[in-house]
């Protein structure tokens, strides 16, 4: 089982990451990763990224863009 430090490092290495990506890279259950990401956010180590800022091109005007949003995290700046 990965530690909070490994989850934080995984986000750092990817720049931005969601629970699915971290879960896959660390071979952990996604609900566990979500809980760890939320914990790291509460500790001030990570921050949620406004996903709408990430949307570009045709995705920005897509009506389904908000339906497929997931929480994306990055290191707190």
UniProtKB/Swiss-Prot annotation:
Iron-sulfur cluster binds at residues 54, 59, 62, 68. Gene3D superfamilies: Winged helix-like DNA-binding domain superfamily/Winged helix DNA-binding domain (1.10.10.10). Pfam families: FeoC (PF09012). Keywords: DNA-binding, Iron, Iron-sulfur, Metal-binding, Repressor, Transcription, Transcription regulation. GO terms for molecular function: DNA binding; iron ion binding; iron-sulfur cluster binding. May function as a transcriptional regulator that controls feoABC expression. Belongs to the FeoC family. This is Probable [Fe-S]-dependent transcriptional repressor.
């Amino acid at each position: 089982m990965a530690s909070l430090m490994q989850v934080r490092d995984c986000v750092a290495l990817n720049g931005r990451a969601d629970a699915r990506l971290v879960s896959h890279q660390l071979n952990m259950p996604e609900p566990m990763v979500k809980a760890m990401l939320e914990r790291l956010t509460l500790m001030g180590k990570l921050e949620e990224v406004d996903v709408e800022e990430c949307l570009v091109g045709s995705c920005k005007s897509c009506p389904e863009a908000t339906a497929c949003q997931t929480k994306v995290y990055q290191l707190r700046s």
